[in-house]
Amino acid sequence: MKNLFLLVSLLFLLSCGKQELDWLILSPNNVNGLTNLKFLLSGFTTTIFISIVSISLSIVLGLIVAIPSLAKNKFLTYLNIGYVEIVRAIPLLVLILWIYYGLPIMTGISFSPFVSGIIALSISESAFQAEIFRAGINSIRKPQWEAGSSLGLNFFRKLRLVILPQAIRNILPAIGNQFVYVLKMSSLVSIIGIGDLTRKAN
């Protein structure tokens, strides 16, 4: 029964899509193929650049958002929770379209498609990065904070010199996963005319 199911699934998959795909259009052995390949690679470099810039900005913004959640002030804690929950609830495509089309109408401030895409990706990802940083910082045991206090360090110096170096080792895998997520979701910026890999492939 299992083999029959696999056979039916294989036949179904083989029937999907176009059978006349010509992969020789990307062959570097002919002039047209080489041109097409360079065209696709230019989109690939754009995708990688957008992803790296977006993840870098989101890490900085995420850390800024995460720090107030460590405070005992309830207002700051609720502000942090509100930002994270609202931003994570907004679909990325909606955010991209709103920043590129909606923001100029409402405020008169407009950005190029490239900048709009990076802003949208950075804001959307910053909410996830904030939670990653918060979890990483909270994973450091209380004696480490007390050790920083015994050295006469203030809150931010304790965070920078004692806590964050240890927390970063714990959260690196999660940040790596989020980079892969941003790399995949960056394909949505093609909707506002950015020549990334998705748009060039189409």
Task: Name each model feature, range by range.
Residues 8-11:
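Bacterial N-terminal signal peptides
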Residues 2-4, 14-202:
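Transmembrane alpha-helices and adjacent helix-loop boundaries
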